């Protein structure tokens, strides 16, 4: 049977350590490795990691953050985990996509703010793709002015140039970069090693360099994840090792 074009052929150096499993037994290795804590998140540079980590270390910090970067570089994941580590699953966190902003959104935001004050918590508002607010951005600006330094607002965007200058002036902007092929190798190896797959760094580097399109120099986490899943599916997979249960012998 002919091999599907979507799955790259692997050089002979790729080896499997562990037991082969069928595709049906093989969920996405990348999805299983989704970050659960801030320290699990992959960053392309330590400056951004350290600056954003302060919002976790000091939960009393307020203000407005804009996370800008290319598609699939982890902006929404960063925002969600900052909120989770500061507030857990309380009702003081409100998340919305920019294109879902409705006439009653400000009413909901004020309700969240008032509830958080009763609970003596600093509320967090996450607005994904804030540039898609378009002409409604001034309503968000007025809300930020109304509650200045009394909540944390985390906004994400793929297009910083589409955000009104007054919002950018009121916010700290952090560039969430993609990963150059050398850094992508490090990210991929952490997941592959969990599944007992031995892949040479140079082979991974060549694979990621081939995934760059045109004059691109960086890969998104989604691109790295798809490559990892293809490798796990093709080469084989074993579950992360757990202590085996003792065998009982009846005599």
Predicted segment positions?
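Pre-Walker A (pre-P-loop) alpha-helix and adjacent loop at the N terminus of AAA/AAA+ ATPase modules
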Residues: 24-68, 112-115
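Conserved C-terminal helix/linker of AAA+ ATPases
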Residues: 232-251
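Conserved AAA+ ATPase "SRH/arginine-finger" region at the nucleotide-binding site
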Residues: 98-99, 172-185
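Short conserved motifs of the RecA-like P-loop NTPase core
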Residues: 198-215
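Short glycine-rich substrate-engagement loop in P-loop NTPases that contacts/grips substrate
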Residues: 46-50, 91-123
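Conserved catalytic/switch belt of AAA+ P-loop NTPases
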Residues: 114-115, 127, 131-169
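Walker A/P-loop
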Residues: 56-95
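The conserved phosphate-sensing helix
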Residues: 213-232
């Amino acid at each position: 049977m002919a091999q599907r074009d979507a799955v790259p052929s692997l050089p002979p150096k790729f080896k499997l350590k562990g037991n082969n499993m069928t595709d049906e037994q093989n969920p996405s290795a990348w999805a299983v490795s989704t970050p659960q804590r801030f320290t699990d998140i992959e960053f392309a540079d330590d400056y951004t990691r350290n600056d954003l980590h302060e919002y976790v270390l000091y939960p009393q910090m307020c203000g407005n953050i804009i996370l800008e970067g290319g598609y699939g570089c982890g902006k929404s994941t960063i925002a969600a985990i900052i909120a989770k580590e500061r507030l857990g699953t309380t009702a003081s966190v409100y998340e919305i996509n920019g294109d879902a902003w409705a006439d009653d959104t400000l009413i909901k935001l004020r309700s969240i703010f008032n509830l958080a004050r009763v609970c003596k918590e600093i509320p967090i508002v996450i607005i994904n793709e804030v540039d898609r607010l378009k002409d409604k951005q001034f309503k968000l600006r007025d809300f930020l002015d109304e509650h200045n330094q009394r909540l944390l607002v985390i906004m994400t965007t793929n297009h910083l140039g589409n955000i009104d200058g007054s919002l950018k002036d009121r916010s700290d902007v952090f560039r969430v970069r993609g990963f150059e092929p050398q850094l992508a190798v490090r990210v991929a190896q952490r997941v592959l090693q969990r599944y007992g797959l031995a892949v040479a760094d140079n082979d991974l580097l060549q694979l990621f360099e081939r995934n760059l399109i045109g004059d691109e120099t960086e890969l998104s986490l989604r691109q790295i994840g798809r490559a990892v899943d293809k490798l796990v599916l093709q080469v084989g997979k074993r579950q992360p090792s757990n202590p085996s249960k003792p065998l009982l012998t009846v005599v």
